[in-house]
């Protein structure tokens, strides 16, 4: 994917004094003009899946969107909270769906730009158990509002593991993807209420809906999204939720893995059935 290189970063620097420095990427332009939406995810590999195509899909549809994912694999809300307490420079700074090789803390990322949307999520293995969210999600939301009081905080509802997968059979206590999703949906709803979230990105519901409609493969390893249709579904879900724009005729095709016409049709139908403009 080459569209990241259409963004020219005029100022990217770390001023690191005992890991307490600042990270600044807020002077950015693109061949579409100024950035008109800035999205930051405090997440893990599931937000990585969701953001892989988001910037490029938005660009394809004529919108300049800056996306940043703070990545630690399998990162729990409790780990995010502990990293906040120590201002740990522990996160891979993923910019517009690509790795950068830069490490940052949550604070450094928060102050690096005037974010429009900041997303929070739980690690997938605990996503159906609300007791694992609290009190960490509340503390993280409070910290986010301290540094970015005008940003919208949104919950990223993640998805269930695939039926028949080792992940579902051995890692969690559910017997079916539908059972896992029901627990996930309830837990994220409680989390959104607890932090007075500005909204929810319904990736989990879009994923299970697409699977019901016959999407295969939706996962690549039983739990992460497939590199083609799965990640495309997530990008469309985020794009429509964040912008309200119509996706019915979307023709984005810069994928890491082939997306067939049949898969595209299912993905668009599923997202449209879940996300109402």
PLM feature segments, named:
Residues 38-40, 46-134:
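Conserved SGNH/GDSL esterase-like catalytic core that processes O-acyl groups on lipids
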Residues 47, 51, 137, 181-185, ...:
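A structural signal for well-ordered alpha-helical scaffolds and beta->alpha junctions
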Residues 35, 218, 222-225, 229-231, ...:
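Conserved catalytic region of serine esterases and O-acyltransferases that act on ester linkages
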Residues 104-228, 240, 249:
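Alpha-helical cap/lid subdomain in secreted, periplasmic
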Residues 9-36:
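Short, Lys/Arg-enriched N-terminal segments with co-localized hydrophobic residues
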């Amino acid at each position: 994917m080459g569209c990241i290189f259409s963004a020219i970063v005029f100022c990217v620097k770390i001023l690191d004094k005992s890991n307490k420095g600042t990270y600044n990427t807020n002077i950015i332009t693109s061949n579409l003009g100024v950035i008109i939406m800035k999205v930051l995810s405090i997440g893990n590999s599931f937000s990585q899946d969701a953001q892989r195509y988001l910037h490029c899909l938005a660009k394809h549809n004529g919108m300049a969107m800056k996306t940043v994912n703070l990545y630690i694999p399998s990162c729990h809300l409790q780990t995010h909270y502990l990293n906040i307490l120590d201002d740990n420079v522990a996160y891979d700074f993923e910019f517009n769906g690509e790795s950068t090789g830069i490490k940052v803390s949550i604070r450094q990322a928060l102050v690096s730009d005037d974010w429009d949307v900041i997303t929070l999520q739980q690690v997938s293995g605990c996503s159906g158990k609300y007791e694992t969210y609290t009190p960490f999600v509340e503390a993280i939301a409070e910290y986010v509002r301290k540094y970015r009081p005008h940003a919208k905080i949104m919950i990223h509802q993640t998805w269930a593991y695939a039926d028949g997968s080792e992940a579902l059979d051995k890692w969690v206590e559910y017997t079916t993807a539908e059972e896992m999703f029901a627990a996930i949906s309830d837990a994220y709803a409680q989390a959104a209420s607890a932090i007075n979230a500005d909204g929810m990105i319904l990736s989990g519901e879009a994923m299970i809906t697409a699977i019901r409609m016959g999407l295969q493969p939706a996962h690549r390893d039983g739990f992460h999204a497939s590199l083609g249709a799965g990640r495309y579904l997530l990008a469309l879900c985020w794009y429509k939720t964040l912008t309200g724009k119509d996706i019915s005729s979307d023709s984005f095709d810069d994928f890491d893995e082939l997306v067939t016409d049949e898969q595209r049709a299912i993905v668009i139908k599923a997202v449209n059935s879940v996300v109402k403009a």
